[in-house]
Amino acid sequence: MLHTNNTQFHPSTFLVVGVPGLEDVHVWIGFPFFAVYLTALLGNIIILFVIQTEQSLHQPMFYFLAMLAGTDLGLSTATIPKMLGIFWFNLGEIAFGACITQMYTIHICTGLESVVLTVTGIDRYIAICNPLRYSMILTNKVIAILGIVIIVRTLVFVTPFTFLILRLPFCGVRIIPHTYCEHMGLAKLACASINVIYGLIAFSVGYIDISVIGFSYVQILRAVFHLPAWDARPKALSTCGSHVCVMLAFYLPALFSFMTHRFGHNIPHYIHILLANLYVVFPPALNSVIYGVKTKQIREQVLRILNPKSFWHFDPKRIFHNNSVRQ
């Protein structure tokens, strides 16, 4: 039952209603979400394929890009298919375990993305401020250690949020006025008080990531403007263009969503929901487009693969050779 007066720690189901106030246009809302999902799916799969098959792209920067693409695939797949089920087929009912799993996956993916963007900022800092030692600093061993640190840090900060929800008793209405199982939407259905400490921790972690990225770019700008040759400055800054665009695509929707939730009390509720969707739906698609367009190595390899002449002259022995070299 979705409506009950009994207090339960683990109710059987919740009802995710979609975008409150826009139920009549759910079918039409689903089409841009579907297009965004296809873009995210195809774009990130292509990026992973290109990085895996092209030996010239086996560099730290592209390893981090592969991590980002994998994270984007997880985030978009954890959210958009269920949204489309709600928009097109009214499949809003979701089991408690599935709802918790979706919430946990969203937290994991957004946490991973934030850390990967932070590490990528450090990568750009080393590449521009200390280029001669770049390959000596970011060795394969260091990249592997950074990958482990990224995963461990995300798990350490995200897992407590899930245990907090599991400890809360739920009573009354089981309706979530959202398009996915959002943490605060679930917490508001609880009969117990919400511990704000976890929210402060999440905000602090995000602030630390942004601060590290900001410090990296301050140092990058200082190094660039100290270059003796004027024509070298735009070239140096262009290597950071993709990362800056991806960073803005990730953090700006989150900032707008937070600001409207905190201060926009007179803003219609459906605006809050749509902004929250921007935060989890659009970055995975935008990231693949941004890196595909602005990163020369990725763009050239994608065009070569999509070129019919290159396709018919595609030599599978080259991929086998690349894999043999790595082994």
Curated annotation (Swiss-Prot):
The alphabetical list of record keywords is:
Cell membrane, Disulfide bond, G-protein coupled receptor, Glycoprotein, Membrane, Olfaction, Receptor, Sensory transduction, Transducer, Transmembrane, Transmembrane helix
Primary localization = membrane
Q: Which GO terms describe its molecular function?
A: G protein-coupled receptor activity; olfactory receptor activity
Q: Which Pfam families match?
A: 7tm_4
Where are the membrane-spanning stretches?
Answer: 31-51, 57-77, 102-122, 145-165, 196-216, 239-259, 273-293
State what this protein does.
Answer: Odorant receptor.
What is the recorded name of this protein? Olfactory receptor 52E5
Q: Which organism is it from?
A: Homo sapiens
